[in-house]
C-alpha cells in the first residue's frame, strides 16, 4: 500500500502510519505542475545576472560571494558534502522514513524550486527501502536541520551511506543495488533539501505519538491501581470535571469512570469505608493526566502545521520572486518538544506514586508488603518500584527546556537558534523510560487486583490483565524480574494494553 500525500493537508493519522508502519509514499500527481513551475523559475533566475541567495551565491556568512553560472552544480554538491558533519549513532529507519516523507510534503508545495526528478528519487528510495544513514546529532534547529538533512541528501547523490535490506552500504552502492541512479543537483536543489525542519519535526512527531499511546495506557494502569487500592471512583464524576471545563480533564475523567464501570471490587466498599478521600495520585488522575493530554494536543496542532509547512530558504513566491525568509527556524518545534517533555514527566511521576502506594502496606488498604505473597521470604515488587523511581528522576532531569538555550553559529550570521533537534530527540529516551514506568504500574496494578480475589475488577480491566498475563505470569514467588519489566514495557509501547480497550473509551489527540 502506497500513501498518496497532498502537501499542505497531510493529517497526523497519516504521519503516524508512516512512522509506525513504514509505508511508501508518493506526492499526489495534481501537485506536479506546481513543482515544475517553481523549478523552471529557479532555472531562469540561475541563468540571469541578479544575485539570489543560495542559487548563485555562497551560503550563510558567505552569502555575499557571487558564484559563476558554470559552478552552480558544483556549488550544490559542495554544499551537501561540506554539511555532512553529523555525529553519533544512526537514526532509526522509521524516523528517517518520516523525515523523507516530510521533506516530500515540503517540496511538494511548489515553493522550493526543485525538479520533479528529485521528488521521484525520494519516492523511489522509500518504495525500494534505500534509507540514508543519518547520524543523530549535529543540528541546532536553524538554519534548519542542516547536517542531518545533508546526510540524507548525500545518499541521493551517491555519496555518504545508506541502509539497504539491513546492510549498511555506501550511498552509491545502496542506490545501485535497488536499481536507482543518483541525482545530479541543479540550482538551489541542494539547499532546498538540507534547509528545513524535517529532522526535528520527525523526532518530535515520534515523541508525540509515543507519549500519546503512553498517556492512554497510563489511564488504564491508573484505573487498575485505583481498583487494586480499593480507591473511589467518585472523583471521576463527570460534573466535577465539567465544572472546571478543561477538555483533557473531562476526557480523562470519563475514561477512568468507564474503565472502572462494573467492578465488584468497587462495589464491595461503597458502604462502610472509613476513608474519606484517596491520595492525590488516585484522586487527581483526571486533573494531571488530563492536563498532559491537553498539552499533547496543543503540541499535536503545532506539529501538524509544521509537518505541512515549507521551511527552506529562499522560497519561490506566487508572483515568481525568490525571497529570503526564516521559515527554517524551528522554534515552534522546539516549544512543542518541550511541552511533550513536560507531559511525559508528569504522566510518569503520578504513575510512579501509584506504584509506590500499592507496594506500601500502610497505604494500600490491606495488600501485602510489596505485593509479595510471603513478605520477608519474598521481596515481591520492591525493587521494581525503585526502578520506576530511577526512571522518573531521569526523565525529570531530561525535561529542562531545550528551547531556552541558544548559541550563535556561522560567524554570527545565524545568531539565534532553536535547539529543536536534540530537544525532540530526547523524547525517544524519555518515552522509553515512561513506557517502563507504566509497564511496572501494569504489573503492580494487575497483581494488586488479583490479590483482591474472589472480588473481581471491571470487564474492561479484566481484558487488560488477560493481555498482560499472556506475556507475564502472575508473581507467586520471587523470580528473575528483568524480563517481566521488559515485556510489560513492550506491551505499553506496542499498544497491546491500550488495544484491548473498547473503542471510544480512551481519548484521541483531536487536533
Swiss-Prot record:
Where can this protein be found?
Cytoplasm
Q: Which UniProt keywords apply?
A: Cytoplasm, Histidine metabolism, Lyase
Q: Point out residues bearing the modification 2,3-didehydroalanine (Ser).
A: 143
In which family does this protein belong, per the annotation? Belongs to the PAL/histidase family.
- Species classification: Bacteria, Pseudomonadati, Pseudomonadota, Alphaproteobacteria, Hyphomicrobiales
Q: In which pathway does it act?
A: Amino-acid degradation; L-histidine degradation into L-glutamate; N-formimidoyl-L-glutamate from L-histidine: step 1/3
Q: What is the primary gene name for this protein? A: hutH
Q: What is its EC number?
A: 4.3.1.3
Quote the catalytic activity from the record. Answer: L-histidine = trans-urocanate + NH4(+)
Which InterPro entries has this protein been placed in?
Aromatic_Lyase, Fumarase/histidase_N, HutH, L-Aspartase-like, Phe/His_NH3-lyase_AS
Q: What is its main location?
A: cytoplasm
Protein transport in keyword set: no
Kindly provide the PTM information from the record.
Answer: Contains an active site 4-methylidene-imidazol-5-one (MIO), which is formed autocatalytically by cyclization and dehydration of residues Ala-Ser-Gly.
For this record, an example GO cellular component is: cytoplasm
Q: Which domain of life is it from?
A: Bacteria
Protein source organism: Brucella suis (strain ATCC 23445 / NCTC 10510)
Per its record, how is this protein called by name?
Histidine ammonia-lyase
Q: What residues does the 5-imidazolinone (Ala-Gly) crosslink join?
A: 142-144
| Top EC group | lyase
Q: Which GO terms describe its biological process?
A: L-histidine catabolic process to glutamate and formamide; L-histidine catabolic process to glutamate and formate
Identify the PANTHER family for this entry: HISTIDINE AMMONIA-LYASE
Amino acid at each position: 500500500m502506497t500513501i498518496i500525500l497532498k502537501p499542505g493537508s497531510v493529517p497526523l493519522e497519516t504521519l503516524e502510519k508512516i512512522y509506525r508502519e513504514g509505508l511508501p509514499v508518493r506526492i499526489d500527481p495534481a501537485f506536479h505542475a506546481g513543482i515544475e513551475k517553481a523549478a523552471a523559475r529557479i532555472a531562469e533566475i540561475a541563468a540571469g545576472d541578479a544575485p539570489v541567495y543560495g542559487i548563485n551565491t555562497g551560503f550563510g556568512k558567505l552569502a555575499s560571494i557571487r558564484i559563476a553560472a558554470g559552478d552552480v552544480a558544483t556549488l550544490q554538491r559542495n554544499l551537501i558534502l561540506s554539511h555532512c558533519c553529523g555525529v553519533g549513532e544512526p537514526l532509526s529507519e522509521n524516523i528517517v522514513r518520516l523525515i523523507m516523507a516530510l521533506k516530500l510534503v515540503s517540496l511538494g508545495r511548489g515553493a522550493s524550486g526543485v525538479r520533479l526528478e528529485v521528488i521521484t528519487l525520494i519516492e523511489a528510495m522509500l518504495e525500494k527501502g534505500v534509507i540514508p544513514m543519518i547520524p543523530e546529532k549535529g543540528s541546532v534547529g536553524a538554519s534548519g536541520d542542516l547536517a542531518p538533512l545533508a546526510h540524507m541528501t548525500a545518499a541521493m547523490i551517491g555519496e555518504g551511506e545508506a541502509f539497504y535490506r539491513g546492510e549498511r552500504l555506501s550511498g552509491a552502492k545502496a542506490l545501485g543495488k535497488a536499481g536507482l541512479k543518483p541525482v545530479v543537483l541543479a540550482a538551489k536543489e541542494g539547499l532546498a533539501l538540507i534547509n528545513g525542519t524535517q529532522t526535528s519535526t520527525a523526532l518530535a512527531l515520534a515523541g508525540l505519538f509515543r507519549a500519546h499511546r503512553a498517556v492512554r495506557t497510563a489511564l488504564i494502569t491508573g484505573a487498575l491501581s485505583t481498583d487494586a487500592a480499593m480507591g473511589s471512583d467518585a472523583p471521576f464524576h463527570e460534573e466535577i470535571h465539567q465544572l472546571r471545563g478543561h477538555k483533557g480533564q473531562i476526557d480523562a475523567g470519563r475514561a477512568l469512570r468507564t474503565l472502572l464501570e462494573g467492578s465488584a471490587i468497587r462495589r464491595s466498599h461503597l458502604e462502610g469505608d472509613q476513608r474519606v478521600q484517596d491520595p492525590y495520585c488516585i484522586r487527581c488522575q483526571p486533573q494531571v493526566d488530563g492536563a498532559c493530554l491537553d498539552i499533547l494536543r496543543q503540541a499535536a496542532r503545532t506539529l501538524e502545521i509544521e509537518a505541512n509547512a515549507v521551511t527552506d530558504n529562499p522560497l519561490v513566491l506566487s508572483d515568481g520572486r525568490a525571497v529570503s525568509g526564516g521559515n527554517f527556524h524551528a522554534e515552534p518545534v522546539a516549544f512543542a518538544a518541550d511541552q511533550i517533555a513536560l507531559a511525559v514527566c508528569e504522566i510518569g511521576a503520578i504513575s510512579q506514586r501509584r506504584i509506590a502506594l500499592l507496594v506500601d502496606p500502610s497505604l494500600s488498604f490491606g495488600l501485602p508488603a510489596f505485593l509479595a505473597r510471603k513478605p520477608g521470604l519474598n521481596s515481591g515488587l520492591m525493587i521494581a518500584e525503585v526502578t520506576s523511581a530511577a526512571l522518573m528522576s531521569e526523565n525529570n532531569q531530561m525535561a529542562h527546556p531545550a528551547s531556552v538555550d541558544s548559541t550563535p553559529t556561522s560567524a554570527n550570521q545565524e545568531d539565534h537558534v532553536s535547539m529543536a533537534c536534540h530537544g525532540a530527540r530526547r523524547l525517544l529516551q524519555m518515552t522509553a523510560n515512561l513506557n517502563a514506568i507504566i509497564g511496572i504500574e501494569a504489573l503492580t496494578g494487575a497483581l494488586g487486583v488479583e490479590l483482591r480475589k474472589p472480588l473481581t475488577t471491571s470487564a474492561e480491566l479484566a481484558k487488560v490483565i488477560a493481555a498482560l498475563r499472556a506475556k507475564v505470569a502472575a508473581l507467586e514467588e520471587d523470580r528473575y524480574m528483568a524480563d517481566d519489566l521488559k515485556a510489560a514495557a513492550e506491551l505499553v509501547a506496542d499498544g497491546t494494553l491500550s488495544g484491548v480497550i473498547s473503542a471510544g473509551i480512551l481519548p484521541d489527540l483531536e487536533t
